[in-house]
A protein has these predicted regions:
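Well-ordered alpha-helical scaffold segments within catalytic/enzyme domains
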Residues: 18, 84-97, 146-161, 194-206, ...
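Solvent-exposed loop and edge beta-strand segments that line ligand/cofactor-binding
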Residues: 2-3, 58-80, 96, 131-144, ...
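Catalytic-core region of carbohydrate-active enzymes that cleave or remodel glycosidic bonds
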Residues: 281-302, 325-377, 388
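C-terminal beta-rich recognition modules with glycine/proline-rich loops and embedded aromatic residues
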Residues: 10, 213, 292, 358-366, ...
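Hydrophobic core segments within long, regular secondary-structure runs in both alpha-
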Residues: 15, 22, 34, 84, ...
Length: 641
């Protein structure tokens, strides 16, 4: 059963959890990031992203701009694109003249950096215009274009303004000429433009953009490998160029329909799979969809962390092999979990099965939210499940897994990505087709459907387990609400009367078909009992350990609550207990306690004497809130004794 996500403007958040997160992004995160992109905050990692675009515009107007005036990564433009997209979604919540003015000025500047033929990329315009389109593998021209296409579609949908949409349509036309008529064997080094072209096609109706997206999917990985040949012939490199080309990293080892295992760079992988799933949906390509299902199984059944993190190593920011899920040398990039949400949503649009929304929820409420500090001013790129200050971020094997969030990064892909995901949450929470309105995630606020009814959701999720929807308007239609797999005992009522879930539930959704009337209610009560979770015996890193999950939230132990975390053991057979909601703690949480003990340390490195243990109640907090109280030890998985 196929579906479409709702437009971002169709959802308006209330002052619940999601509403507060969106308010934080709107009032704090976006202005902060805009200042960083303009290099207006001293003492932190320089961005220069908007200045690069200004330099490109000046060069096109005839100013003598030196190549070394460009600063930053080859994909620096994409930081600006993601910020514009996040700002667009924020504007859907209400007017903000100052924010809209900042976006409009940035768009005007970006338009001034576009070449006559539609090409637009500040790195090549400023630094090496003679090398445009000569390094498709590494140079990120298509990646940057894709992100700006997404921004253009978002800004047009929210504001009705076409300037950026026209700029990126011209850019897409340029890309079409280059890759459909000239270099027809090439495909993006970093997938992104595929999913973006599909969005641009929906916004403009231009069939060329869907055709190009499908082309990029179809030619990827065909023999002989394009990237191998390109590297032999191009004569220059973005990076040092000495390493052998890793086709797993570039998602080009096999044609996409032959891929079965998620490999290589995790963000590239899930961005590619998102584009594949979208193309499969819109072209009714069952072979391509079958490949997407195989890749989904590979990730979620064998290569995903309990937190919805993906990518097990900093070596290539990549997937490794099945069940290799180390907790301390993990990568689990924030962008990768955002990309996993993209992929999950597209699979959900192909076939409405609860497992896709379950993973989307797991990724969002754990890894994605952990990627941003509670004040919105610091960010994680990497999301470890175990941290020991002095080792984490210090030892060469642990250098990527930091114990605290930096203010910014030289490679700052994650901060604006979190902002756009939080701001667009409504379009992930709901979807619909001609017959059914789907509630995929629980988000407090009001959502307008195309069925003639409006739903207002009151929920205490994710810390509470109730979600009540009040209907406004009248229509005979179906509302399908997801029953989460983690809820062992769920209660669904319509106008206060219990529904037999066994009779109405299919693939994780309860389907309620009726003549809905003004004032009708649909209420879901979920089981929020905290549970001990055991890992598969195939995961070496978690052998003999357990973690705790309550609802969608994975919990962790932090040193600030428990003293040193490394000596802690959970008592065998202990049951976790949820405490009362603490509104003043970490923005408002429900802590969990579990019985355990702490191993007393010894004076030597090793000893033949058995250690002593003292009983201890272990306090746990939601994983997304960790590292908000200074540098300290943290663990998700705790050994059992």
């Amino acid at each position: 059963m196929k579906s479409e996500r709702i437009p971002v403007k169709s959802f308006s958040a209330d002052n619940g959890f999601i509403g507060k997160m969106q308010k934080l992004v709107r009032e704090e995160v976006l202005p902060y990031q805009y200042n960083i992109l303009n290099d207006a905050i001293p003492g932190i990692e320089k961005s220069h992203a908007i200045e690069n675009i200004r330099l490109a515009a000046e060069k096109l107007r005839g100013k003598d701009v030196k190549p070394d005036e460009f600063y930053g990564m080859v994909f620096q433009d994409s930081d600006v694109a993601k910020w514009i997209e996040a700002a667009a979604y924020a504007l859907a919540a209400g007017e903000d003249p100052e924010l809209e003015k900042a976006v409009d000025e940035t768009i005007q500047l970006y338009g001034a950096s576009q070449h006559e033929d539609g090409y637009v990329d500040s790195y090549f315009t400023v630094k090496c215009p003679d090398k445009m389109w000569t390094n498709i593998c590494d140079a990120h021209e298509l990646y940057c274009a894709g992100h700006m296409m997404e921004a253009a579609v978002a800004y047009y949908e929210v504001t009705g303004k076409r300037e950026l949409l026209d700029i990126m349509s011209k850019s897409a036309d340029c890309i079409y000429e280059q890759f459909m008529k000239k270099n027809t064997r090439a495909y993006p080094g970093h997938p992104e433009v595929e999913l973006a072209l599909m969005r641009l096609w929906r916004a403009t109706g231009n069939e060329k953009y869907k055709e190009l997206a499908k082309h990029f999917v179809d030619v990827r990985g065909q023999a002989p490998n394009y990237f191998v040949e390109e590297k032999k012939n191009r004569g220059w490199n973005v990076w040092d160029g000495t390493e052998e080309l890793n086709t797993d990293y570039t998602q080009s080892t096999l044609p996409v329909r032959e891929q079965k295992d998620a490999v290589g760079h995790a963000v590239r992988a899930v961005y590619l799979y998102t584009g594949m799933a979208d193309v499969a949906k819109e072209t009714q390509d069952e072979t391509l969809l079958a490949a997407c299902r195989n890749l989904w199984e590979s990730i979620t059944k064998r290569r995903m962390y309990i937190t919805g993190g993906i990518g097990s190593t900093f070596m290539g920011e990549a997937f490794t092999v099945d069940y290799d899920l180390p907790n301390d040398t993990v990568y689990a990039e924030t962008c990768a979990s955002i990309g996993l949400m993209f992929f999950a949503k597209k699979m959900l649009e192909n076939e409405h099965r609860g497992e896709y929304a379950d993973v989307m929820e797991r990724a969002f409420y754990n890894t994605v939210l952990a990627g941003m500090q509670l004040d919105g001013k610091r960010f994680f790129y990497v999301n470890p499940l175990e941290v020991v200050p002095g080792i984490s971020g210090k030892a060469v094997t642990h250098r990527a897994a930091l114990p605290t969030r930096p203010q910014w990064y030289a490679c700052a892909c994650c901060p604006p990505n979190v902002a756009r995901m939080v701001s667009s949450f409504g379009s992930y929470a709901y979807s619909e087709n001609d017959d059914t309105f789907f509630i995929d995630l629980y988000a407090g606020g009001t959502v307008k459907t195309e069925k003639g009814i409006t739903l207002t959701c009151e929920t205490d999720f994710p810390h509470g387990g109730t979600a009540k929807y009040t209907i406004k308007g009248e229509a005979e239609t179906t509302v399908a609400i997801r029953i989460p797999a983690w809820s062992e005992k769920s209660l669904l009522t319509v106008n206060g009367e219990a529904v037999d879930l066994n009779a109405v539930t299919k693939d994780g959704y309860a389907y309620i078909t009726r003549a809905w009337k003004d004032g009708d209610t649909l209420a879901l009560t979920m089981d929020m009992t905290p549970h001990v979770v055991y890992a598969s015996a195939k995961i070496a890193a978690d052998s003999g350990k357990v973690c705790v999950q309550r609802g969608a939230l994975v919990y962790c132990a932090e040193e600030v609550d428990n003293g040193k975390v490394l000596p802690l053991y959970v008592k065998a057979g202990a049951e976790p207990k949820a405490l009362d909601f603490e509104p003043e703690t970490l923005g408002g949480i429900v802590p969990v306690e579990i019985a355990g003990c702490a191993q007393q340390d010894i004076d030597t490195l090793y000893s033949t004497k058995a250690p002593k243990f003292v009983e201890k109640t272990i306090r746990l907090i939601p994983y997304y809130t960790w590292a908000n109280r200074g540098e300290n030890q943290m663990r998700v998985w705790l050994p059992v004794k």
